Regions:
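Catalytic Walker B motif of ABC-type/P-loop ATPase nucleotide-binding domains
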Residues: 159-162
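A short, proline-enriched helix->beta-strand linker immediately N-terminal to the Walker B motif
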Residues: 153-157
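Helix N-cap at the start of a conserved alpha-helix in ABC-type nucleotide-binding domains
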Residues: 170-172
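Helix-to-loop junction immediately C-terminal to a conserved catalytic motif
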Residues: 48
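Conserved ABC ATPase "signature" region
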Residues: 64, 111-129
């Protein structure tokens, strides 16, 4: 579990995060949604230590990341898997070498052990046959699957996904969502997904946080976000035709 307690963050005179309180549950797909420029990515970067907070606490299973020394922070970062918006894969490395990369950086595993682990992770995303090829030989959807394999290579306790469906067609998005959900439940990971994709929110979101103007305006489950009357959330939700249909259908069933 991850807890965010009273977190504030400014850049110059601009306060980007204002007294944020939130919780992200273990074994659940936790989603951060909201309009662009309202603090979603900044919050995620603060949680994983890419930005320092001005004040507040970030607890990883009750361990306060903000007061840890460098060595302690490194140990926590080893427990975090990252799936980036862009694939962030190394074109000069094979698929297998990409998955092995964090293992080579942060473990003392032998090459054989790393290959075995990489093969296991690639098999988990149905890409075993791709191990000796290069990422550039694959579509965006397959590159995302390679990214997932790399993200779970270290057997993480926490998984952060930044816009995992960005640039993907609907069919591929459903596949990526399914993998994220399966891995979260199978390994009991605390997963945090930053997204604009309301389809994903309804399909796999267990715990949803709506951030607006740098504040946590609302947090709840998918049923709650479908039925909420909060005007700021509604303005964001109704930008999705899919969500309009879902809300209309639910309202009709309740009549």
């Amino acid at each position: 579990m991850i807890q965010v307690i009273g977190v504030n963050k400014t850049f110059g005179k601009n306060q980007v995060l204002c007294d944020i309180n939130a919780h992200f549950d273990q074994g659940k797909v936790n989603m951060i949604i909201g309009q662009s420029g309202h603090g979603k990515s900044v919050l995620a970067k603060c949680i994983v230590g890419l930005h320092e907070v001005d004040s507040g606490q970030i607890l990883f299973n009750e361990r306060d990341f903000t007061v840890m020394n460098r060595s302690e922070r490194t140990d926590v970062r080893k427990e975090i898997g990252m799936l980036f918006q862009g694939s962030a894969l190394f074109d000069s490395m094979t698929v297998e070498e990409n998955v092995m990369f964090p293992l080579s950086m942060f473990t003392k595993m032998t090459k054989k052990e790393m290959q075995t682990r990489a093969d296991f992770c690639l098999d988990r995303v149905n890409l075993t046959a791709a191990s000796k090829l290069f990422p550039s030989e694959y579509s965006g959807g397959m590159q995302k699957r390679i990214g997932i394999a790399r993200a779970i290579a270290m057997n993480p306790k926490y998984l952060f996904c930044d816009e995992p469906n960005s640039g993907l067609d609907p069919k591929t998005s459903i596949l990526i969502d399914g993998l994220i959900k399966e891995i979260t439940y199978e390994y009991n990971i605390t997963t945090v997904v930053i997204t604009h994709d309301m389809n994903s929110v309804i399909e796999i979101g267990d715990n949803i946080m709506f951030i607006h103007q740098g504040k946590n305006w609302w947090q709840g489950g998918r049923e709650d976000i479908i039925t909420t009357e909060n005007p700021e959330i509604l303005s964001f939700v109704y930008a999705s035709e899919f969500m309009k249909e879902i809300r209309t259908s639910m309202q009709q069933r309740r009549k």
